[in-house]
A protein has these predicted regions:
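Flexible glycine-rich active-site/ligand-binding loops centered on an Asp-His dyad
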Residues: 112-148, 182-195
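A generic local secondary-structure boundary/capping motif
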Residues: 83-88, 141-145, 160-165, 230
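Conserved active-site and cofactor/substrate-binding residues in soluble primary-metabolism enzymes
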Residues: 2, 6, 31-39, 51, ...
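Tryptophan-centered motif/residue detector
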Residues: 53-56, 133, 143, 154, ...
Length: 255
């Protein structure tokens, strides 16, 4: 068994058993961003679940893009419930976009305007954050990236028709956990969400054949990064994320 497969199996086994890893076994840890993405794709293929969404955020340094697929079993309509057995219970307040057109992987480059013309709806989203490792934040960013950038679930609110992206960039996010309002950003913290989605669409051409052949599809939801950093819920927490003009999304830990 090769290193990529060993690493993918370790992440899957840790999730199934609800245990944490101190490190990747048998020297299988990713040594590059390319290997981290190969591990993501191997986990995806081994689990056999359909992609329903993607998360994408700005890169830094050698990590030119941070992104991960989110499978159909991890996407929930608000109001949603997650298990109290989740250890970290990290919470991010986000805005997500649903594509109305396929964006197949191709040699040409997708532009920001291509993305603008491909988006159907926009929605408030809550990302539930978990790690399969024993520390937070994960010390090695490549490990976090291989672990689907620490995604556990994506909860989406009511969708509204896509409108002026400049107005969306200037919205103010609010996150409330157990009636306590967290600090969130006014204005999109990750630059330009449409440019991020264009980077994601172009990134498909360098993924494994399993992902490359799929590309991005009409109906895919793309969430574009946190407006609050990461805050943390506790047992039986009730979480609400709000954006003016978009509405809200709700998550509860109680099952």
């Amino acid at each position: 068994m090769d290193r990529i497969s060993i690493a993918a199996d370790a992440l899957i086994d840790a999730e199934i058993a609800n245990i944490v890893l101190k490190e990747f076994p048998n020297l299988s840890a990713p040594k590059s961003i390319e290997e981290a993405f190969l591990i993501q794709d191997a986990v995806l293929e081994k689990r056999g679940r359909e992609i329903a969404a993607w998360k994408v955020g700005p890169g830094s340094g050698e990590m030119t893009i941070t992104c991960a697929p989110i499978t159909v079993d991890r996407v929930f309509k608000s109001p949603a419930k997650l298990a109290n057995s989740n250890r970290l219970k990290g919470i991010e307040c986000e805005i997500a976009f649903r594509l109305g057109k396929d964006l197949p992987s191709m040699g040409a480059t997708y532009s920001r305007d291509d993305i603008k013309n491909s988006i159907k709806t926009v929605t408030v989203a809550i990302e539930a954050v978990e790690t399969r490792f024993d520390n937070w934040p994960v010390a090695n960013p490549l490990w976090a990236l291989a672990d689907n950038q620490s995604n556990e679930a994506l909860i989406i609110g009511d969708e509204v028709e896509f409108f002026d992206e400049q107005q969306i960039k200037g919205l103010e996010g609010r996150l409330v956990i157990d009636q306590q309002e967290m600090v969130a950003d006014a204005g999109f913290p990750g630059g330009d969400p449409l440019s991020l989605i264009a980077e994601l669409a172009n990134h498909m051409s360098v993924r494994s054949s399993y992902v490359q052949e799929r590309g991005l599809r009409s109906g895919d939801i793309i969430t574009t990064g946190s407006w609050n950093g990461v805050d943390f819920a506790t047992q039986n927490s009730l979480i609400k994320a709000y954006f003016d003009e978009l509405g809200s999304a709700t998550l509860e830990f109680n099952c």
